[in-house]
Amino acid sequence: MRILQVVRTMNIGGLENFVKNMLQYLSEKCDCGCLICDEKKSDHEDDLVKAGIKIYHIPEPDKTKINLYNNLQAFFETHREYDIVHCHMAGTNGIVSKAAKDAGINKVVCHSHGVALQQDEALSMKLYMLCMRKLMQRHADAFIACSKAAGNYLYGQESFGEVGKVVPNGIEINRYRYSDDERNSCREELGFKESDFVIGHTGSLNSVKNQELILDIAGILKEKRIPVKVLLVGGGNREQDLKKQAKDLKIEEDVIITGKQMGVTKFLDAMDVFMFPSRSEGFGLSLLEAEANGLPCVVSDKIQPEVKVLNSVLSVSLNEPIQCWIEAVEKAKVLGRSKMANEILDEKGMSEAACYETVWKIYNEVLSK
C-alpha cells in the first residue's frame, strides 16, 4: 500500500505533529509520502526523511486557490503510484480531493482537525465552505475528524453523521510521563523556586489560543501575594503583544516565553497547573499531552469533550467573569497531579497506536470498496 499525506506545512504545531507521528508509525506498514503545499523547508522534514518518508513540495496556494488545483493536478498526474491520498487541508480538502480524482488517483480520505473560527461566519466564507463540502462529498471516499464538532464543521452534520468517523488524536503517552528529576532540573534551569506556583501553557502564540487571559489571571494572583510564575511554551505572532501585556501588568519578571520547542515534556514537568483557554479548538493535542503528564488543567468551554479525559480537567466558560477562572485555577492547584494519568489515557484509547491503527483500518476499508 502507498499512502500520500497532503498538508499545508510541516512546522511545529498540533496538526503537523499529529501527521508527523502518524507518518513515522505507518512507515513501518507501507510506503509513505508527504506533499507539502509550500516550497519552504518545514521544521519536521529532517525527521521524516530519516524515517524513509518521501517529501514533496508544490508552491503555496494563492488567494483564489486556482494555482493550488493546477499544481496539485500536475503533481498527482506524475505520482499515480499512490493508492490513497489523505488530505489535512481543512476546507481546501475539497480542491485536493477533486485534483486527485481528476488526475487518476484511486482513493481519497479527508481529515478534519478544526472547528469554525470567527471569520468563518462571513457570507463569503460560508459560500466557500459549501462549495468545498460539495467537492468532498463527490470525490472523497472517507471522512475522518478528530472530534464530532470538527466533523460537523467541515463535512456538514448530515454527511458526517452518515459516513464520518471520529478518530481522536492520539499521543505517545509514556513520552509525557511525569518525572520529579526532570521537574527539579527544568525549574532550576528556568530560575523557578520550589515555592513558586507555575501556571503553564503549550501552543502557538496567537489570538485563538487566548494566552492573554493567563497573564490577566497571573496579574491578579500576584496582587494577592501568591508567588505565581507563567511559563508559555511556544512561539507565534502574539509574542511581542504578550510581553507588552506582562510589562503593563508588572509581571514581566514572572513570565517566561520559550519560543518554539521540539519537545515539551520537561516544561510540563516544571508546571503546577496547565491552562488552555482557547477561543476555538478542533481537538487540543496540547491538552492531551498535559493530561498525560498528570497536570491538573483549567480549560475553556470551547475544548471538545473527546479530549477532556481526566477528572482533573476543569472547564470554565469564556463568558464567565475572570474570578471564576481564578477559582478554577486555585481548585486545580489543590487537586495536584494525577498519579494514574498514563494508565487512564491508555485505557480510554488515547494512545497514538490506537489512533493510527484505526486510520490503518479505514485505509483498508477504503481500498476494499
Name each region found by the language model.
Residues 14, 336-369:
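A charged, aromatic-enriched C-terminal amphipathic alpha-helix characteristic of glycosyltransferases
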Residues 138-177:
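A short, active-site helix/loop in glycosyltransferases that binds the activated sugar's phosphate group
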Residues 87-95, 112:
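Short His-centered aromatic/hydrophobic patch
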Residues 13-21, 197, 201-220, 237-243:
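A conserved mid-protein helix/loop that constitutes part of the nucleotide-sugar donor-binding site
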Residues 5-68, 75, 164-166, 236-239, ...:
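N-terminal strand-loop element at the rim of the active site
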Residues 35-36, 296-300, 305:
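Short hydrophobic beta-strand element within catalytic cores of glycosyltransferases
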Residues 260, 279:
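Aromatic "clamp/platform" in nucleotide-sugar-dependent glycosyltransferases that forms part
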